[in-house]
Amino acid sequence: MMITLRKLPLAVAVAAGVMSAQAMAVDFHGYARSGIGWTGSGGEQQCFQATGAQSKYRLGNECETYAELKLGQEVWKEGDKSFYFDTNVAYSVNQQNDWESTDPAFREANVQGKNLIEWLPGSTIWAGKRFYQRHDVHMIDFYYWDISGPGAGIENIDLGFGKLSLAATRSTEAGGSYTFSSQNIYDEVKDTANDVFDVRLAGLQTNPDGVLELGVDYGRANTTDGYKLADGASKDGWMFTAEHTQSMLKGYNKFVVQYATDAMTTQGKGQARGSDGSSSFTEELSDGTKINYANKVINNNGNMWRILDHGAISLGDKWDLMYVGMYQNIDWDNNLGTEWWTVGVRPMYKWTPIMSTLLEVGYDNVKSQQTGDRNNQYKITLAQQWQAGDSIWSRPAIRIFATYAKWDEKWGYIKDGDNISRYAAATNSGISTNSRGDSDEWTFGAQMEIWW
């Protein structure tokens, strides 16, 4: 009995240590991709994206090593109330050498408090830098609703018929506002903070296994006292989003309609841009005097329409499928807008629960508002893959791939004598435009991808 009593303090200490370790356990999440590739005509792997398109079909078409490393921990919990601290550091290099130095991007650092407001059970208040309720198309790595950045908000307020979320975030533009001495001659330049105010109502039941989410985003350039935006710069804008999600075939289909105005049209995802639409240059006079000018250059006043349908479904025990179809029209007052449509599929055949073959076929077509010319590209990738599971979403995955792309481009981006971005008809020389002309290429390689 004496021996048993002596062992008791040690057992209590060990148990306390285990419980303490569990309470202090750190969550480790993240994403990464890396690989090696070659181009048929020689050299390292090339990647293919149509000029004017805001994304590309990514399977066998990613030329960088990218990683997001997330560390988080629930630092306090009492009943159903809790605080969670979350961080995210991202890295990107060109995967050309063993040692590639890079400056990491500190993308997330926030605290989320759940059930802290007694009269709003189930809600979460938060503050800090955060990936906030992002909506994307995975197969083209396209974020169509993403206001991520430093901010604060409250989310998942239960209204009975749906859940309400409110947030404010910021994205700053370099050199967006000026102090002027006279007309367009400026003395100083200052970065401009663009604020975004976001309202979302989610979980609206519309039909069996179908839900609707509605959102309104207002973005504005918030200048410091004594500074103002150059003439022609967009000052604010709106974006409206409606997204219907249908659960089907062990997956989902999302149908999205979006409309944006002015400062919200450039990125088209809920973040304002346009305060830096007026660039600057310096003129040096014969006596050595330097005069700084603010150009009345680009503004994004106008509107954007987007209609998008995408999803991922299972077509039986052996087949899975990802797909996307999108039409987007940016109509700007300065005629520098684009009309872009894209369609693509990625079927997956599963030989075993951990081995599969994927085929990705994607097509992009982009029309210049100014010239009326079109750029088009199609890209085909065949990949053999080994993955941790039998789903098209299963990761980690190791794949070997071969990619073929063909394009015919009639216009490209250039700047005229006033440093204004314009479009021009493509030339074979590639000197007067940035168009890729009419050509094709193929690549091959291997890649790993993981999220956890």
Swiss-Prot record:
It is found in: Cell outer membrane. One of its GO terms (molecular function) is carbohydrate transmembrane transporter activity. It comes from the Bacteria. Keywords: Cell outer membrane, Disulfide bond, Ion transport, Membrane, Porin, Signal, Sugar transport, Transmembrane, Transmembrane beta strand, Transport. Gene3D superfamilies: Porin, LamB type. GO terms for biological process: monoatomic ion transport; polysaccharide transport. It catalyses: beta-maltose(in) = beta-maltose(out). Disulfide bonds join C47-C63. GO terms for cellular component: cell outer membrane; pore complex. The record marks Y31, Y66, W99, Y252, W393, W451 as: Greasy slide, important in sugar transport. Induction: By maltose. It is a multi-pass membrane protein. Residues 36-64, 94-104, 131-148, 174-191, 223-234, 264-300, 334-336, 370-372, 411-436 are extracellular. Substrate binds at R134, H135, D136, V137, H138, M139, I140, D141, F142, Y143. SUPFAM superfamilies: Porins. Residues 1-25 form the signal peptide. Homotrimer formed of three 18-stranded antiparallel beta-barrels, containing three independent channels. Involved in the transport of maltose and maltodextrins. Does not act as a receptor for phages. Belongs to the porin LamB (TC 1.B.3) family. This is Maltoporin.
